[in-house]
């Protein structure tokens, strides 16, 4: 974004606040926002109070007390101020801290409120030479000069920017890109910056704070706040900040924009709309009219301002919005009451109607905490007041109290209760198959309910433990927050049904008397004309019996929980809702760290000595195309050997961070020793190849020796046989010597050649050319052998690396992080230039299409509707997997008696549907379709005085300009991606896995519920939900359902791609990408300008350059040290370069001081490479030893090609062997040729 500030032209300086200039249209300081004025007044008052507190004397304290002793009368202004000062002492926590005072001082000039319809929605900030306002904040800046500016909008950074007016530039703050980890300042105090993220304690910051700046400890702005993401005890801030070269936006996952809402929610009552937070109607106070108030809330239950309306109805303050307090979190429960419901097991194996009925248990917290909902209410008294030591429960039609200390929760043993409020209990229980809740009532009787519930300890991390450790590491987890404040979670309430009670009916002389005891009673009978009615006073039904009467206690002044074990009053479901405590939040849990593995390295393997305290998971993966992945739980002390291929391996032990191993080419023997030591050396590196070569050489030597012996034997036979058959024949001297004939007498060589010339000239030439042919043959064999070995050696060492002399240059750099590419660019008239390119980071990002999100579900079962003496009918509702069924022949009973009193048949309408579980916002999986991936690479380019890192998309051609030089990167040689076309993302893990399409989920499988987002209304569900017939006599809604497919997938899922990705890829999920995959090469073309070179006349001049290698360890990262000696005729700085891939130099340039030490890395045992310093060159030759360690934790920065890599000593021995064998064969051939020539001559 080119209009963001990249330089600061105006610094901040201190000066007294001046009055408005006559020509300046800016309003006086008094028109600054009221909030800031109040803050400044509070600051001045707090500082004054602090000064008075430190410097006050005894007479001054006496003066403060004098006005109190006088009679009441109008006080002057001065004593009033003195009376107000002590009030500040009562609330010292309101005094701004040092950080807040500093920010308020700076903010007074550089930030302005943004208002929409008179309401503050955010802030704008003057930074550098720009005014910045978050783009998502509606409204205009509350300043006439700034409001009329023309703003440019950047959707990438969510900012609107404009140039600051000249008259206001002195008010702007500086900014800085330097952000060392630590604490920074903003309006509410300290901001922690660690790991590239800004965080504040949860509860600090809210909607309306968007646009506030974050300052460093000296005053410059380091970031601008846009929003926040709740992460449990901390809130991660979404900010726009500055890096060294660019502006960047940091957006944590789950970020909510902090612009204040501008919409006023409206509610309805009898077709009259009003603001929900400020109702102006008569029945809007619960204390004045409970029943109409509840009905009003039921009619607006789906309104966005429902809770504002509920708050106004409870507090009965219609004139203004009242401030909510922590002490009033229980006040919403004034509208509710506990209840009694059917419990199948009341502690002794029998059923009952219990006030301790367990409605629901949630075990979504990964720290093992259970959230239990039951029928009674904790922390409330029967008079609707708050008392955390009390439990109120339903005792018939009344409400009774019990002591909170008698509450017990049991599993396989007693649980620890950690929090209670309303209907909810937080408890940590040992693993078990049941849960029971009990308390002792006011009559000293135990009220218990028990249900079957399987629960076990959840696994956090990679070690199974039972006790929280004192020392370890913190891992992300979830827990139920111990807060009673309003949350986003809620439960449904409804008007309770009429409760049958036969105890209020009594028989008196043929009449039935109804004793109401101050209640409202609805009655019905089959006697006379007074069949049905409602009464609030005692009533007598004449000429009737109790068996023909039924009485119901009616109470519509309070809600109760919408329980499936209590019938609802009406078929049309009317409900309200209240917030529930203890929301599920993200936090961190301390987990143990197993003792570190002891590593013993071997040849291409590493042995881990493991000493686990708990069952601990060990996993490893190898790099390369053919990956190997394995994991196992280690329960006892053991040793595990893992292979270490050439590409490397990564293992993770328990909760420790992953460790990587790379093979070091170590071996026994010596590359520069005797033949058996050389064979031992190469056998350790390449056993198969060494065995094959040794066998082949041995066979060749043996065959050569056998052939030589055979030729000698044949020659001797041919030359001796004629003389043996001829009596008196004399063997010539030459033949005798060649054939080892005893007593041989032969003519001299000259006589023999003269005889051949006279008698057979053909034989003369044959005998003359034999030795010459043998000499030529030996020479050719030696040359061929030397040429062959030398060619192979040069090919292996890649002699002749890139030296470019053309104007357009091309190169191919490896797509491997940390592996440098270096080239020597030569241009006529200029000193050679060293070019180095190195991949710093790669990111393979696929194009994703979100198919749906899936998670656990919860089954909502509303209270059943029982139609007495009639038939109920189901109605279609637009809810996920909505099921409705009507069952006849039911005879429900409640604690007060039969619910229905008639001769005809009763029916029960049961309903159930599926919703996303509350845990979904913390625990869900996203199903994506992956398409073409883009490969983004960060490449560090160094040449001359240029050292810059650039980003390029190398899956195609991407041009980048670096210091005036145009570089074109890509396309990468090997298009590859680790992602399949269908992928799943779950809690930072990625899985290549197939999944059903949207709307085709199956019960019990992944995707049984599906939605586009976590709060959308397009939820699809197929969980196999079926309603069952209720048991006779009980009010309940039985159903069957397939267990959650998401939970099943969690248990059965395979290892994620994060743990087994090939080529060393690091898988990230926010966004989805594969980092640092070592696959393929990246072609580069460039056009280096002349200005990047140094002319020969300006370059340093050195001569007599020599290179001496002092020490060398091959296959080690820069394990070689060489000393360059030279004479300096003109000093300066010279580029240094190796002209061979055999060795990679660590240094790029050196200062010419006559002697320089350089470091190089090589995989060769006898490297020989040319080093150039400026225009001079020298050859470095070394004899390297193998490294001592078999396995190392870092890759070496050199060419890993080692075959055929023969050391100079091995080459010498090979030449000697070849020369000896060749000489033996040559002698045998020479003897055979001479003998053949002589025999043919005869």
From Swiss-Prot:
A lipid is attached at residues 719, 739-740, 1237 (S-palmitoyl cysteine). Residues 26-42 have a biased composition (Low complexity). A motif (Nuclear export signal) lies at residues 141-151. Belongs to the Old World alphaviruses that usually cause fever, maculopapular rash, arthralgia and myalgia. Structural polyprotein: Translated from a subgenomic RNA synthesized during togavirus replication. The record marks 184, 217 as: Involved in dimerization of the capsid protein. Residues 74-86 have a biased composition (Basic and acidic residues). Glycans are attached at residues 271, 586, 760, 947, 1076. Residues 35-66 are annotated as: Host transcription inhibition. A motif (Nuclear localization signal) lies at residues 59-96. The keyword ATP-binding does not apply. Structural polyprotein: Specific enzymatic cleavages in vivo yield mature proteins. Capsid protein is auto-cleaved during polyprotein translation, unmasking a signal peptide at the N-terminus of the precursor of E3/E2. The remaining polyprotein is then targeted to the host endoplasmic reticulum, where host signal peptidase cleaves it into pE2, 6K and E1 proteins. pE2 is further processed to mature E3 and E2 by host furin in trans-Golgi vesicle. GO terms for biological process: fusion of virus membrane with host endosome membrane; proteolysis; symbiont entry into host cell; symbiont-mediated suppression of host toll-like receptor signaling pathway; virion attachment to host cell. Residues 350-353, 386-388, 508-511, 540-546 are annotated as: Interaction with host Mxra8 receptor. Residues 14-101 are annotated as: Disordered. Residues 259-272 are annotated as: Functions as an uncleaved signal peptide for the precursor of protein E3/E2. Its EC number is 3.4.21.90. Residues 96-110 are annotated as: Ribosome-binding. Residues 714-718 are annotated as: Interaction with the capsid protein. The chain crosses the membrane at residues 691-711, 762-782, 786-806, 1218-1238. Residues 152-157 are annotated as: Interaction with spike glycoprotein E2. It is an enzyme of class 3 (hydrolase). Residues 719-739 are annotated as: Transient transmembrane before p62-6K protein processing. One of its GO terms (cellular component) is host cell cytoplasm. Residues 890-907 are annotated as: E1 fusion peptide loop. This is Structural polyprotein. Residues 712-746, 783-785, 1239-1242 are cytoplasmic.
């Amino acid at each position: 974004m080119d209009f963001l500030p990249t330089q600061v032209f105006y610094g901040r300086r201190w000066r007294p606040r001046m009055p408005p200039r006559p020509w300046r249209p800016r309003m006086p300081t008094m028109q600054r926002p009221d909030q800031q004025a109040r803050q400044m007044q509070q600051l001045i008052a707090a500082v004054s109070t602090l000064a008075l507190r430190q410097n006050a004397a005894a007479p001054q304290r006496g003066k403060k007390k004098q006005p109190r002793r006088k009679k009441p009368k109008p006080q002057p202004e001065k004593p009033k101020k003195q009376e107000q000062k002590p009030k500040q002492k009562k609330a010292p926590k309101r005094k701004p801290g040092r950080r807040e005072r500093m920010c308020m001082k700076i903010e007074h000039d550089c930030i302005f409120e943004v208002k929409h319809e008179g309401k503050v929605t955010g802030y704008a900030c003057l930074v550098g030479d720009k005014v910045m306002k978050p783009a998502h904040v509606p409204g205009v800046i509350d300043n006439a000069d700034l409001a009329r500016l023309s703003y440019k909008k950047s959707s990438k950074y969510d900012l609107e920017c404009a140039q600051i007016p000249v008259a206001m530039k002195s008010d702007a703050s500086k900014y800085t890109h330097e952000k060392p980890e630590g604490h920074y300042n903003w309006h509410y105090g300290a901001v922690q910056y660690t790991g590239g993220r800004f965080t504040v304690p949860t509860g600090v910051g809210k909607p309306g704070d968007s646009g506030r700046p974050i300052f460093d400890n000296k005053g410059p702005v380091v970031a601008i706040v846009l929003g926040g993401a709740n992460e449990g005890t901390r809130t991660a801030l979404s900010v726009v900040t500055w890096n060294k070269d660019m502006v960047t936006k940091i957006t944590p996952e789950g970020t909510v924009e902090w612009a204040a809402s501008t919409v006023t929610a409206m509610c309805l009552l009898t077709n009259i709309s009003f603001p929900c937070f400020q109702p102006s109607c008569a029945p809007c106070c619960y204390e004045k009219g409970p029943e109409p108030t509840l009905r009003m809330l039921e009619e607006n239950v789906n309104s966005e301002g429902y809770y504002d309306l509920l708050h106004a109805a409870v507090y009965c303050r219609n004139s203004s919005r009242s401030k909510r307090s922590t002490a009033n979190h229980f006040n919403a429960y004034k509208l509710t009451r506990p209840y009694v419901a059917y419990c199948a097991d009341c502690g002794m194996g029998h059923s009952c109607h219990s006030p301790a009925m367990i409605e629901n248990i949630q075990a979504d917290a990964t720290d093992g905490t259970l959230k239990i909902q039951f029928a009674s209410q904790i922390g409330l008294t029967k008079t609707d007041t708050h008392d955390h030591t009390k439990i109120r429960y339903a005792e018939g039609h009344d409400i009774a109290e019990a002591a909170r200390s008698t509450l017990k929760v049991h599993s396989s043993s007693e649980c620890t209760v950690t929090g209670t409020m309303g209907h909810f209990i937080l408890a940590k229980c040992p693993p078990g198959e049941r849960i029971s809740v009990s308390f002792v009532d006011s009559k000293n009787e135990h009220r218990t309910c028990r249900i079957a519930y399987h629960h076990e300890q959840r696994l956090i991390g990679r070690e199974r433990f039972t006790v929280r450790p004192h020392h370890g590491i913190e891992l992300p987890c979830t827990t139920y927050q111990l807060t009673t404040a309003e949350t986003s979670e809620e439960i449904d309430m409804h008007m309770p049904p009429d409760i049958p009670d036969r105890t209020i009916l009594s028989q008196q002389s043929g009449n039935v008397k109804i004793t109401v005891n101050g209640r409202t009673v609805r009655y019905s009978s089959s006697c006379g004309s007074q069949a049905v009615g409602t009464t609030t006073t005692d009533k007598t039904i004449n000429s009737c019996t109790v068996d023909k009467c039924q009485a119901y206690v009616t109470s519509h002044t309070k809600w109760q929980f919408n329980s499936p074990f209590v019938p609802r009053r009406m078929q049309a479901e009317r409900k309200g809702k209240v917030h529930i405590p203890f929301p599920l939040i993200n936090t961190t849990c301390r987990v143990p760290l197993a003792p570190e593995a002891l590593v013993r390295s071997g040849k291409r393997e590493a042995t881990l000595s493991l000493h686990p305290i708990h069952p601990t998971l060990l996993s490893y993966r190898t790099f390369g195309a053919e990956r190997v992945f394995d994991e196992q739980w280690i329960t006892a002390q053991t040793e595990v050997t893992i292979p270490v291929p050439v590409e490397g391996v990564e293992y993770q032990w328990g909760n420790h961070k992953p460790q990587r191993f790379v093979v070091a080419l170590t071996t026994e023997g010596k590359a520069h020793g005797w033949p058996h030591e050389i064979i031992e050396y190469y056998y350790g590196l390449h056993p198969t190849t060494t065995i094959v070569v040794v066998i082949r050489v041995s066979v060749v030597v043996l065959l050569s020796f056998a052939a030589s012996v055979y030729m000698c034997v044949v020659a001797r036979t041919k030359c001796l046989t004629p003389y043996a058959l001829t009596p008196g024949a004399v063997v010539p001297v030459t033949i005798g010597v060649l054939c080892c004939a005893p007593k041989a007498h032969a003519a001299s060589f000259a006589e023999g050649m003269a005889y051949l010339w006279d008698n057979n000239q053909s034989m003369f030439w044959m005998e003359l050319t034999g030795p010459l042919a043998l000499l030529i043959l030996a020479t050719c064999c030696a040359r061929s052998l030397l040429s062959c070995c030398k060619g192979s050696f040069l090919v292996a060492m890649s002699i002749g690396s890139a030296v470019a002399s053309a104007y357009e240059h091309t190169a191919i750099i490896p797509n491997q992080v940390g592996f440098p590419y270096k080239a020597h660019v030569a241009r006529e008239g200029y000193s050679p230039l060293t070019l180095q390119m190195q991949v710093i980071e790669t990111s393979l990002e696929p194009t994703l299409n979100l198919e749906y999100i899936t998670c656990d579900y919860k089954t909502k079962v509303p209270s059943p509707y029982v139609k007495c003496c009639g038939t109920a009918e189901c109605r279609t509702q637009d809810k996920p997997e909505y099921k409705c069924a009507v069952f006849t022949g039911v005879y429900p009973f409640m604690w007060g008696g039969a619910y229905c009193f008639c001769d005809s048949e009763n029916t029960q309408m049961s309903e159930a549907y599926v919703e996303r579980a509350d845990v979904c916002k913390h625990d869900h999986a996203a199903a994506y379709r992956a398409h073409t991936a883009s490969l983004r690479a960060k490449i560090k380019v160094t040449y001359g005085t240029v050292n810059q890192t650039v980003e390029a998309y190398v899956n195609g051609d991407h041009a980048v300009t670096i210091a005036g030089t145009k570089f074109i990167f890509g396309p990468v040689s090997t298009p590859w991606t680790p992602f399949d076309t269908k992928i799943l993302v779950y809690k930072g893990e990625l899985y290549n896995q197939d999944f059903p399409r949207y709307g085709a989920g199956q019960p019990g499988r992944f995707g049984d519920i599906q939605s586009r987002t976590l709060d959308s209304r397009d939820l699809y569900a197929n969980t196999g939900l079926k309603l069952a017939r209720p048991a006779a006599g009980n009010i309940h809604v039985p159903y069957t359902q397939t267990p959650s497919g998401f939970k099943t997938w969690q248990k059965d899922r395979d290892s994620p791609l994060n743990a087994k990705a090939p080529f060393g890829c690091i898988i990230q999920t926010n966004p989805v990408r594969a980092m640092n995959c070592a696959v393929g090469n990246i072609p580069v073309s460039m056009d280096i300008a002349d200005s990047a070179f140094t002319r020969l006349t300006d370059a340093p001049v050195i001569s007599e350059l020599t290179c001496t290698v002092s020490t060398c360890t091959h296959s080690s990262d820069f394990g070689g040290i060489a000393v360059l000696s030279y004479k300096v005729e003109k000093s300066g700085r010279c580029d240094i370069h190796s002209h061979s891939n055999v060795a990679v130099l660590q240094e790029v340039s050196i200062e010419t001081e006559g002697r320089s030490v350089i470091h190089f890395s090589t995989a060769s045992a006898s490297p020989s490479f040319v080093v150039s310093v400026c225009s001079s060159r020298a050859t470095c030759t070394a004899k390297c030893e193998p490294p001592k360690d078999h396995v190392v934790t870092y890759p070496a920065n050199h060419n890993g090609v080692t075959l055929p890599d023969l050391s100079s000593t091995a080459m010498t021995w090979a030449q000697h062997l070849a020369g000896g064998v060749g000489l033996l064969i040559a002698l045998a051939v020479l003897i055979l040729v001479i003998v053949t020539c002589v025999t043919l001559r005869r």
